[in-house]
């Protein structure tokens, strides 16, 4: 019984498999396209074949003569005749089909022609009545589908491209300059997507309905906006548009991390476009137009120096190839040696002598500039190179003062920590130690001068721009620590002076050895070993040491000026960034083992051979110095026979050393090596970009004199102050007059005079608007038009010089096929005409022969 059931089950399974195989065989490999609705008549099949292969005579004849032909019929793939003709670049067939009314899927044919770059077919389709209003060019296929029809549909399943792809977006994606120009003239535009965090109803609804489609639509729009074809032809200022768009795309790369690579690629595409336009400049005028923007709207300084707004923007957005481009660097170098044109071609020795001369005569040069800032010498000192040299010399002197201030302790201090030393018997010891020396007084003057310079920079740039530069933060920290150090030192001096005043008033003895003083006074007579840990002088000395370290580290700021040291400084900065990234993992591992080891050994304080791990502080010190091999294994050994605790300590300590030293430190070394290799591979661009940032900080007007010479205001400063006060008073008077006029106009609101005046004002504003609309292009616009024209021509030439690909070979094949059908048609027409002529001749000759035969017969009869 069991065997019979098993046999029946196996037989049923084989029957099922045979039926399934039979169904698959019936469906065949093209089952997906064998739908009932796609059956065609022989006439329709011939019509579609003729449209596909460019048989113009057959298509024309069938469209003109056939009464039953459905010219919107589709093949097995769902394509109609128009789509087949466009896909195979048959212009004449397309023009014949476009003459028919109610032609379907014209929009998809347009998208197909754009994707293949068929310019003439695009022009023919755009002349179709469906595009008369131009509204269809601004709507996406999805919006068209929601409104009325399948205008952009590939088949009944939808469009062949994404639902958000408009013709102008597709043309921009394909870098079709001519098609983009045609669509722009038709009024098509690419709408910039809303901000990523936009909460409007439209964005909220799209995000809720399909977040993926919403993100893809944003990506497609940005691809169109970032294309060189659209940037070149749609914007009045393509350079500014490309720079701002590159920054926006770089910001989106950090926000939409799932599309990070795509956004970074688009951002780099915008940067390459700007570099390409700059590369096409042929003279200084064009380079200045690129670097400064619209020169007619540019605010020039009193000394006729441009603001270099585009370079500042490129540096802010880190468009390094643009800033490091030879055209840009040559212009910056010319401005760098402004008023010193002869020095640029001199040797290094001559330049060194010039720097040495400035170092020696800096005080005298400062006095000369105070007296005559507009003289030839003043103009020379205002040149960026001389400003850089003056500031570098001033800072070098400041560092020298720091060294001199510590020179008296190079061989060790004379007074030990447990000793005191005074100038006279009744002098308080702390009065002598807290007094400021002459070098410290000079250092304070330099610090005040640098603080004033930083305040002016904050005033000119604004706090937001100021904090974006790391060197500004370093300067701010260094100066703040110096101020805190000197403040603490001054507070200690005040307290010591108060103690000295008490001694001078109330102590009558000659010395202070046997005098009983109040505790608050006696404290200032103690040696250093008895000072409180929170003593202001101790805090001052600690802060001063930190400030000195930061001061010497600031030398790296001027290193990019040198070609040899510049790349090293850049590599050092990148290394610091890698260390900060590494610190996240390092701190996580370090804290984990520190807390674990502390919990393990905190109960054994006094029961170990050293105090390691018995407190949090000792745990930190032991683990930190263990990284550098300065901790001993005995740190985990106990005096008691608690082997379990010791074994766990050995294991944890060993795992820590393996993790930190073998794994993490080697990973940090690999990261640093990788960063250095990246800098070395593009060292020239990185160095020139860093040098341009350094140069640009000296191009702005003002801050000519370095610290501490900038503390004394020059006559020019008083003149600028008076002019600024004058402008403020004028603006105040004008605002009051305008307010009074507005009050008067409000009183005459219902009068006839008010109405007449309002109408006259409206007419004047309309005239001004019309004049501004039809005004002549500015010099900057002419230059940009010239450059963009070169860029477009170069792009087209580069595209034509590419190798012939498979698509172009297919186009040639289709053209030959169309030509063959045309020749066959002409041959058939010629053959028909020849047959008609032969028939006519035969008929004519037949009539003549009959007449001759009759004459002969009549003659015989006669």
From Swiss-Prot:
Intrachain disulfide bonds: none
Extracellular compartment residues: 373-383, 487-537, 603-651
Bias-annotated ranges (Basic residues): 10-21
Protein name: Short transient receptor potential channel 7
Function: Forms a receptor-activated non-selective calcium permeant cation channel. Probably is operated by a phosphatidylinositol second messenger system activated by receptor tyrosine kinases or G-protein coupled receptors. Activated by diacylglycerol (DAG). May also be activated by intracellular calcium store depletion.
Modified residues (Phosphothreonine): 15
UniProt-annotated stretches for the region Disordered: 1-21
Keywords: ANK repeat, Calcium, Calcium channel, Calcium transport, Cell membrane, Glycoprotein, Ion channel, Ion transport, Membrane, Nucleus, Phosphoprotein, Repeat, Transmembrane, Transmembrane helix, Transport
Oligomeric and partner information: Interacts with MX1 and RNF24. Interacts (via ANK-repeat domains) with PRKG1.
Subcellular location, principal: membrane
PTM remark: Phosphorylation by PRKG1 at Thr-15 negatively regulates TRPC7 activity.
Glycosylation sites: 514
GO CC list: membrane; nuclear envelope; perinuclear region of cytoplasm; plasma membrane
Location(s) in or outside the cell: Cell membrane; Nucleus envelope
Catalytic activity entry: Ca(2+)(in) = Ca(2+)(out)
Residue ranges annotated as Cytoplasmic topological domain: 1-351, 405-465, 559-581, 673-862
Record GO terms (molecular function): calcium channel activity
Transmembrane segments annotated in the record for this chain: 352-372, 384-404, 466-486, 538-558, 582-602, 652-672
NCBIfam families: trp
Record membrane topology: Multi-pass membrane protein
Family: Belongs to the transient receptor (TC 1.A.4) family. STrpC subfamily. TRPC7 sub-subfamily.
